[in-house]
UniProtKB/Swiss-Prot annotation:
Belongs to the bacterial ribosomal protein bS21 family. GO terms for cellular component: ribonucleoprotein complex; ribosome. Keywords: Ribonucleoprotein, Ribosomal protein. Pfam families: Ribosomal_S21. Residues 43-58 have a biased composition (Basic residues). This is Small ribosomal subunit protein bS21. It comes from the Bacteria. GO terms for molecular function: structural constituent of ribosome. Residues 36-58 are annotated as: Disordered. GO terms for biological process: translation.
Length: 58
């Protein structure tokens, strides 16, 4: 888990922004969204195939 230590003259808002930025860089939020609902293996394969097809034709 990410940790943010607040400096002497740092506001809570700026520390919260740093924390959110760290989570986003670590990919935690994307992982949470991905695991929010169970996805059958067949659906995962289909999504992966469609993503590859989109990448190929762009």
């Amino acid at each position: 888990m990410s940790e943010v230590k607040i400096g002497k003259n740092e506001s809570l808002d700026s520390a919260l922004r740093r924390f959110k930025r760290q989570l986003q860089r670590a990919g935690v939020l994307a992982e949470i969204r991905k695991r929010e609902h169970y996805e059958k293996p067949s659906v995962k394969r289909k999504k992966k195939s469609e993503a590859a097809r989109r990448r190929k034709y762009r």
